[in-house]
């Protein structure tokens, strides 16, 4: 199962819900990683071998592409984008289930996060 790194805008409660489902997830929010710039976060994700989970931010795609071009030997394992800008507490369990399924698809080789995977909560 792939390891996940939840971007600073995602609640540590989501990481906890994922861990309860057997998905290795750590949250940037509330940790020393919260002070990192995006480029530093990409480097940390690459070093830790973790897929970044973040909101669907158009700038993020350009930034991670630039990081990959500038660091050909230090690639981020991938990105999972979730829709919206905020997750309500009542949505955490459902979102964790969807992300767990995406992680299982990655694990089975059915999805490739290197180019970004977009989660559908519909």
Identify the meaning behind each predicted range.
Residues 38, 46-64:
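Acidic, metal-binding active-site segment of PIN/NYN-like and related structure-specific nucleases
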Residues 25, 42-43:
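Short hydrophobic/aromatic segments of transmembrane alpha-helices and their interfaces
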Residues 24-36:
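Conserved BB-loop
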Residues 23-24, 48:
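Short, surface-exposed connector motifs at secondary-structure boundaries
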Residues 1-8, 12, 17-20, 33, ...:
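Acidic, PIN/NYN-like endoribonuclease modules and their adjacent C-terminal/linker elements
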């Amino acid at each position: 199962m792939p390891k996940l790194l939840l971007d600073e805008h995602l609640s540590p409660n989501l990481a906890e819900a994922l861990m309860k489902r057997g998905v290795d997830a750590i949250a940037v929010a509330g940790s020393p990683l919260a002070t990192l710039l995006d480029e530093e976060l990409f480097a940390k994700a690459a070093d830790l071998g973790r897929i970044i989970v973040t909101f669907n931010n158009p700038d993020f795609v350009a930034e991670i592409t630039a990081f990959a071009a500038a660091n050909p030997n230090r690639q981020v394992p991938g990105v999972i984008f979730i829709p919206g800008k905020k997750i309500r507490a009542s949505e955490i369990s459902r979102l964790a289930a969807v992300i767990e399924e995406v992680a299982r698809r990655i694990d089975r080789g059915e999805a490739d996060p290197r180019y970004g995977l977009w989660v559908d909560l519909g």
